[in-house]
């Protein structure tokens, strides 16, 4: 949908499409018609029907949809909310993983702790099970 083709809807217009035969909802100020997707939704059609005609942004984000699901949404977009009725709910981003190496201090701790534990275990073993002189 190019920016020239964008259709704008009010919340009242979206609210009228709240049945199994016409299932629209709002996510991040975009309007989606997911009627054709009802039977394919992995969470079942009930989840989508429950949100029909409403702003489903919070529910959508709470579930933690994958990037594939977010990409798939684009084909069901039919328009956007009119500017006066938009909300400011930030999109949740995918978690980022920190792959940076730790400093030398933490690498020293990584071998020091097992060494100390091994030493303590050895001393305890020798104390309890050490050779006894006769």
Swiss-Prot record:
Gene: Cyt-b5
Major localisation: endoplasmic reticulum
Family per record: Belongs to the cytochrome b5 family.
Membrane-topology annotation of the record: Single-pass membrane protein
Residues that, per the record, bind heme: 41, 65
Residues spanning the membrane: 111-131
InterPro entries, A to Z: Cyt_B5-like_heme/steroid-bd, Cyt_B5-like_heme/steroid_sf, Cyt_B5_heme-BS, Cytochrome_b5
Limits of the Cytochrome b5 heme-binding domain: 6-82
GO molecular function: heme binding; metal ion binding
GO cellular component: endoplasmic reticulum membrane
PANTHER family, per the entry: CYTOCHROME B5
Function: Cytochrome b5 is a membrane bound hemoprotein which function as an electron carrier for several membrane bound oxygenases.
Protein origin, superkingdom: Eukaryota
Alphabetic keyword roster: Electron transport, Endoplasmic reticulum, Heme, Iron, Membrane, Metal-binding, Microsome, Transmembrane, Transmembrane helix, Transport
The name this protein goes by in its record: Cytochrome b5
Location(s) in or outside the cell: Endoplasmic reticulum membrane; Microsome membrane
